Amino acid sequence: MSGLRLEGKIVIITGGASGIGADAARLFTDHGAKVVIVDVQEELGQNVAVLIGKDKASFYRCDVTNETEVEDAVKFTVEKHGKLDVLFSNAGVLEPLESFLDFDLERFDRIMAVNVRGAAAFIKHAARAMVEKGTRGSIVCTTSVSAEIGGGHHGYTASKHGLVGLIRSACGDLGKYGIRVNGVAPYAVATPMTSHDEVTGKQLEDYFDAKGILKGMVLKASHVAQVALFLASDDSAYISGQNLAVDGGYTVVKPSRD
């Protein structure tokens, strides 16, 4: 495949200030899109937009747990660019590993608010904007291999299972408008979300590589962004309701408690 895969497209990327979202913002604009980076990390988000170029990217501060802010972010995008073609709902949070006997339910509420409710709010308002303009749009959500297995991150795992259900439900309803809804499910990636002060990105990558199936390479945020680009573009024109794994075969080989 060659050429600009998102030429003339207008894209919102949530969680676009760092990690997978920032890589996607750079990649999508390289393929001809104009991108609105949405995040609560204002300084980081502004920096990503500036480095990409003000003619290609802009930043909008938004807390995805606040539906009014979500609606305003979509309105900002449509008023600035005249339409919305693609939503990459990528914002997410992760809690520390803990025993279920010590499950922090207040933290669980926060995780569900960001990872599920926040995605639902953006899908809702992005779809409304697409329908209003008659746009056959694409909505892509970052899920996880955790949506296929169990694990110690109980709140995160539950949220990603819920997000896949949301994707499937939205797919069934929005298809009549020509809107596609899909998920991209990465294996573990060293990003600011998964890294901690005492653990370097390289240490995380070494750990993930040891647990992974596909050897000889390490999954990077840029690899996930490439799959998001595929799902956002017309290359996947008849794909909807899918949760596409980017896991090197992990979920088909590894037991859930490995």
From Swiss-Prot:
Belongs to the short-chain dehydrogenases/reductases (SDR) family. InterPro entries: NAD(P)-bd_dom_sf (IPR036291), SDR_fam (IPR002347). The active site is at 156 (proton acceptor). One of its GO terms (molecular function) is oxidoreductase activity. Keywords: Oxidoreductase. It is an enzyme of class 1 (oxidoreductase). Substrate binds at residue 144. Signal peptide: none annotated. NAD(+) binds at residues 12-36. The lineage of its organism: Eukaryota, Viridiplantae, Streptophyta, Embryophyta, Tracheophyta. SUPFAM superfamilies: NAD(P)-binding Rossmann-fold domains. This is Short-chain dehydrogenase reductase 3c. Its EC number is 1.1.1.-. Pfam families: adh_short_C2. Coiled coil: none annotated. Disulfide bonds: none annotated.
